[in-house]
From Swiss-Prot:
Residues 38-106 form the KH type-2 domain. One of its GO terms (biological process) is translation. Part of the 30S ribosomal subunit. Forms a tight complex with proteins S10 and S14. This is Small ribosomal subunit protein uS3. GO terms for molecular function: mRNA binding; rRNA binding; structural constituent of ribosome. Keywords: Ribonucleoprotein, Ribosomal protein, RNA-binding, rRNA-binding. The gene is rpsC. InterPro entries: KH_dom (IPR004087), KH_dom-like_a/b (IPR015946), KH_dom_type_2 (IPR004044), KH_sf_prok-type (IPR009019), Ribosomal_S3_C_sf (IPR036419), Ribosomal_uS3_bac-typ (IPR005704), Ribosomal_uS3_C (IPR001351), Ribosomal_uS3_CS (IPR018280). The lineage of its organism: Bacteria, Pseudomonadati, Thermodesulfobacteriota, Desulfuromonadia, Geobacterales. Belongs to the universal ribosomal protein uS3 family.
Length: 211
């Protein structure tokens, strides 16, 4: 049943850690909704900046947000002007003191979320789905991935009936908990409807004692 479960959630506490790191008792649901609001806002606001992951850490009335992106320059802006504007917007949204930490994703070809978004973008630009999948698989393997699987689901190529097609190269061990598997999901909004794109990238095994 390894293919039915989210590979990131499956490995939490084993080789992966949580994207939200804070503790609360009475305010738990309020802070959880605030996290969702922050993530949705940042995803929309930084749509063209290639954001892969957003981590949130909290302490008292402060929040530290780590943004992992393929294009840090776009978020930081000239002399940090953009990042200051973003900080003010987030502070207004949450009524909290916000610290932003922008981290660069050095190899976007090995980041499942960025690969999924790239395939979705190509599908929106009417690139043939098989070509888009194959191109992403080839470039990920070239940059050192041990295995990759891309699944596209929907009205592929404008077909009357929706279907699911996938393409895999290398190993993608879904049951092995020590396997470092990255997972990403994106949606392509085409004229025929929405096409879902799922990407699984196997980067190697994490041995005990390593993180």
């Amino acid at each position: 049943m390894g293919q039915k479960v989210n590979p990131v959630g499956f490995r939490l506490g084993v080789i992966r850690t949580w994207d939200s790191r804070w503790y609360a008792e009475a305010d738990y649901s309020k802070l959880l909704h605030e996290d969702l609001k922050l993530r949705n806002f940042l995803k929309k606001r930084l749509y063209n900046s290639g954001v892969s992951k957003i981590e949130i850490e909290r302490a008292a009335n402060k929040a530290k947000i780590n943004i992992y992106t393929a294009r840090p320059g776009l978020i930081i802006g000239k002399k940090g002007a953009e990042v200051e504007t973003l900080k003010k917007e987030l502070a207004k949204l949450t009524d909290k003191e916000i610290y932003l930490n922008i981290q660069e994703v050095r190899k976007p070809e090995l980041d499942a979320q960025l690969v999924a978004e790239n395939v979705a973008l190509q599908l929106e630009r009417r690139v043939a789905f098989r070509r888009a999948m194959k191109k992403s698989v080839t470039s990920s393997l070239k940059f050192g991935a041990k295995g990759i699987r891309i699944t596209c689901s929907g009205r592929l190529g404008g077909a009357e009936m929706s279907r699911t097609e996938w393409y895999r190269e290398g190993r993608v061990p879904l049951h092995t908990l020590r396997a470092d598997i990255d997972y990403g999901f994106a949606e392509a909004k085409t004229t025929y409807g929405i096409i879902g794109v799922k990407v699984l990238i196997f980067k190697g095994e994490v041995l005990p004692g390593q993180k």
